[in-house]
Amino acid sequence: MTALAATSLAAGSSNAVPPSTPCALKRTDAHHSEGLDTWNAAYPRPDRRLDAVMIFLSFPDSVPQTTPTELTADHFPATSRFFERASYGKFTLRPHPLREWLPMPRASTAYAIKRDWNSARRSAYLRDALVASDPRVDFSRYDVVYFVADPDAPGVNSDATKVVNLEAPLRADGTDIRRVVTVFERHPPDRLVLAHETGHVFDLPDLYHRPADDKGDWDTYVGDWDLMGSQFGLAPDLFGWHKWKLGWLDPRQVSCVQAAGGEGTRMTLEPLGAGGAAVAGAAGGAEGAEAVESEFRGRRLGGGSGFPSGGLGSGELGSSELGSGGLGFGLGGGTKLAVVRTGRDSVIAFEARGPVGNDGAVCSQGVLVYRVRSETVSGGGPVEVLDAHPDTAACWEDSVYPPLADAPVGLGESFTVPGEGVRLEVEDRTDSGAWTVTISTG
């Protein structure tokens, strides 16, 4: 660690190099690599407005029981609001839904739709969908394509919802279509499922662990702490590392901790969800301050709040407190992410998580610690949350994985990363709700 830190200091000495650069892992050939030194140009980068077309497909063996308008409302504006909050208003996903069903030429059962889909049947489905929709859609106008199947058709399987990356792009309207989102969700669908799948369109990996028999725990890697782990998570905002990758954090908001030994590096971490659309409201006013599901309203936070007297966490959460996050967390321009380089393809990351923005239903708050590996493929554990309280669990009724629900390091606590010699001390809270910490290495 000492040699690595010294190298990082030398690399960061030039004024032309942002101070976060030494901690930026190199992008590798791993599928959805967590490296972020460069952007993979095969994917659209969500740092601006992107347009998405929603195409609704019916089948000759079923009469739709829902309308395209109803299915659109299943996913929007919730999906757009999630990304506007997560990106601090830097990214807008604008949906363009068709208003009618487009008939497919074959019965829904003919495509053998399932989670691990036969590639030949899947290709046939995509070809048929493109032929059915091309007369009605100018694909050159859109950055994202959603093919939404009739949820009541007998051959439709909700487990098959996924992003399909095409080695040989489909071609329509002079445009190469390199990936599509195939939506087979029920009505109503799983919460935030379209946001999860759309994350793959932006080169984000799956963070869940799929058991060999599909019967064990899927959420052992990151628990509730990122949408790409579970759309059901209590704190589904994207990790700060992902926000850095997607271009939503300015370089000055990422602190690369380079000093080894000594007294460590002291800094203030602002809650990840604070700022931009998270404070102003994704769509402005009450509409932009969409509250999380009512079942979480009034639930007391676990793990100790550590807020200043009278601040959030000193009592119950009301519905007005769970939405956009305009709760005195500050303006949102401070440091969001601290990183320690631990190897050629690995880092330890630190970020403050609390009940603001997309994390309104968080179980416990504090400074979350996690490991990132750039050479680990999607689904293989490229991110692992490190549990500061391995002997306890929390929020058994609501959490997707209670053992990690209380993972953050709380006020007055310290945590040493096993095997790395990296130590975090959470010392204080500011009046605006930020966390004062010291990170030591060596």
Segments predicted by a language model, with ranges:
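Non-catalytic C-terminal accessory/binding modules of secreted extracellular proteins
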Residues: L25-K26, H32-L36, E167-V180, F184, ...
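Active-site-proximal beta-strand/loop segments in catalytic clefts of secreted hydrolases
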Residues: I55-P60, V148-D152, L204-L207, S230-G233, ...
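Short, solvent-exposed loop/turn elements at domain surfaces
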Residues: D61-T66, A235-G240, N358-G360, S378
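Extracellular hydrolytic enzyme modules, especially secreted metalloproteases
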Residues: F139, D152-G306, G310, G323-G357
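Secretory targeting and sorting signals
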Residues: M1-A16
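Extracytoplasmic/periplasmic, Sec-exported soluble proteins
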Residues: P46, N118-R122, V183-D190, T220, ...
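Zn2+-dependent metallopeptidase catalytic core
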Residues: N15-H187, A195, D213, E425
